[in-house]
Structure formats: C-alpha cells, structure tokens
Amino acid sequence: ENIQNASPAPGISEAILNADGVILCPSNPFISIGPILAVPGIRKLLIQTGAPIFAITPIVNQRALKGPTAKMLEELGYPVSPIAIATLYRNFLDVFVRYSVSVVIEFNQEFAIR
C-alpha cells in the first residue's frame, strides 16, 4: 500500500550502480523480494547497473526451501519450479542459481565429500 510514494533509502542507488555484483537470496519473490522491487526506481537501477545480478531459487524439487513460496506460485498460476522464479526477474537477471542433484553428486565425488 502506498508503495508508489516510497523511494530507495539514501545510498541505495549508488550502492546498486557501483556494486561488483548483486545477489537476490533464495527468498519468496512475492512477499520478500517483491516489495523491494516494487519501490519506484529499484528495477530501473538493477537494469542500469553494470554489475552482474544473481538470483538463487527458493524452489527445490517443487517445494519451497521455507515458507509459502510454492503455495503462492501455485495460487497465482505459476508452475512450482525454479524457472517460474527466474521469469519473475527476467528483465534484469544475469545468472540464475538452482539446485541440481547431478552437480551435487559431481561436487561430492570431486572433493571426496560424503
């Protein structure tokens, strides 16, 4: 409510534009990341920055890591998948990180981890 009257906190614009990288943590895209992206100017800053922008999926094996993300995706008509999350950030995202069992197995074998 009244998000159109909000503005980035002091220093945020400069921080995004001068960042070496931006990471969107594996959080709910609607109730955690969404309100931040709804602040006027934030999406534009993410598009304008020269920094690579990474997002980490909060969906693994069609389930949320925590919270209501999977349920919300379903209720809003999205598939419960990492790809659905990536599409929400598509206009500014450079790298999308998702869980892959095969990568974990290769990593574990490579580094002799259980």
Predicted segments — roles?
Residues 1-83, 91-93, 98-101, 105:
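Conserved catalytic alpha/beta core of Sir2/sirtuin-type deacylases, generalized to analogous enzyme cores
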Residues 85, 114:
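Short phosphate-binding loop-to-helix
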Residues 103-113:
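N-terminal low-complexity segments that are often proline-rich with Ser/Thr-Pro
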